[in-house]
């Protein structure tokens, strides 16, 4: 939706508010479903303005993660840290680990919890750039390194937990309810245990 909106506004000159309305409706629905009083209207205005200024497809692609990060931080009561302010790329487009580590360590120092959207950062000129692959998984490992975390766990995106391996059992059912500790235990079992 964000790519299509960006193209319609930046390249086809269509009405930005009309094009962005379904996106705002989707995010406002999430906010409502979570029972939050958060308003993203100012963020929507900035995004629409940047679409008009042709901020680029990387910027457009990153805005869903950005808005979801704000919502999640609000829901959890954590600080929101925009990845474009703490994750950096060099002029050649490669990840700048030195600058990123320094900035992340400084910004996160003293914070007990923070939400940092994944899969994007900023070029030296401040424009948003997305990682070529790996996305949020990469960002998580970058943050873990910068804060000298003892452990970084990356749980792959799935549509739920199944009662059996779908490679072995046809159409296994989804587990309706599961605890984090049980999930953790199962994730670390060896193949022989299964």
Give the location of each predicted region.
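Nucleotide/pyrophosphate-binding catalytic subdomain
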Residues: 1-189
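N-terminal low-complexity segments that are often proline-rich with Ser/Thr-Pro
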Residues: 192-194
